[in-house]
Amino acid sequence: MSTPFVTTLSSSLYGLLKDRLEEKGFILTQPQYTIFQARSPSVMCTLYSSGKLVVQGKGSKEFIEFFLEPEILLTFTHNRVEADLRPRLGVDESGKGDFFGPLCIAGVYARDEETLKSLYKTKIQDSKLLNDAQILSLAKTIRSSCTYDVMILYPEKYNELYGKFHNLNILLAWAHATIIDKLAPRPSGEVFAISDQFASSESVLLNALKKKNTDISVIQKVRAEQDIVVAAASILAREAFITTMTNLEQRFSLKLPKGASAQVKSVGKSILNSRGKEVLSLVCKTHFKTFNEICDSASA
């Protein structure tokens, strides 16, 4: 029987952990002296009133490494698997959930063991776990050692494409497929690509790839950023988002907050009132419900 994993959880994370476990299909109960206990067929996760979190079960290793640490604890104390030195291509995006700014998609091709070993020696990890300064620094390292490509869809182009596709996942599939097609060797041989599974069905990306001139096989999985090549792509995509946001702010003399918070809505209203709907449309994603809420509030 494996030794249980024990850690202390900050009270600010109780709700997040509970919500994410429910999303993952865990059955929640509340035995005495606990805040909750969550069970799946292979994992039991118990959060005690003291804040002590205990994880056990045959699936606990994968649960900790691929969910608990990267998504909740934001640490990496669990042993890493052996470095994967298979040549491969990783692709990821940034800006998908941000009302203001572009959508940026990046691909990284690690063509040999030497390239992969150099990546493993760095502090490369999922860009969501890094600050802007770390991202900008690591991006230089990635560009110097890997083949890469970055697509930046400024809001004006993004809105045009969304009007064509009418679906964000189809737009993402087209963009990912375009990047993969540009970077994939021909013939692809044993090289494969890894992408985050952003749609409920893998067929969305596969159908987009069928329209391209590549025979490369693609692995789609949740939390693909756990792979170092996808993590490298996520860093280049985030770097592109950061620098493009700065360019937009300088071009329009505006301060554009990230995300989709109440502050974002407030800034959007200010831009609409002072600069008009046309300028607002040039710095934001107009299919977000936030856009209609801003416009409706101005006409009310």
Curated annotation (Swiss-Prot):
Catalysed reactions listed for this entry: Endonucleolytic cleavage to 5'-phosphomonoester
One Gene Ontology term of the molecular function aspect: magnesium ion binding
Disulfide bonds: none
Domain of life from the UniProt record: Bacteria
EC nos: 3.1.26.4
Necessary cofactors: Mn(2+); Mg(2+)
Residues reported to bind a divalent metal cation: D92, E93, D196
SUPFAM superfamilies the UniProt entry points to: Ribonuclease H-like
Cofactor details (free text): Manganese or magnesium. Binds 1 divalent metal ion per monomer in the absence of substrate. May bind a second metal ion after substrate binding.
Classification via CDD domains: RNase_HII_bacteria_HIII_like, RNAse_HIII_N
Any one of the GO CC terms: cytoplasm
Function comment: Endonuclease that specifically degrades the RNA of RNA-DNA hybrids.
Protein name: Ribonuclease HIII
Protein's organism: Chlamydia felis (strain Fe/C-56)
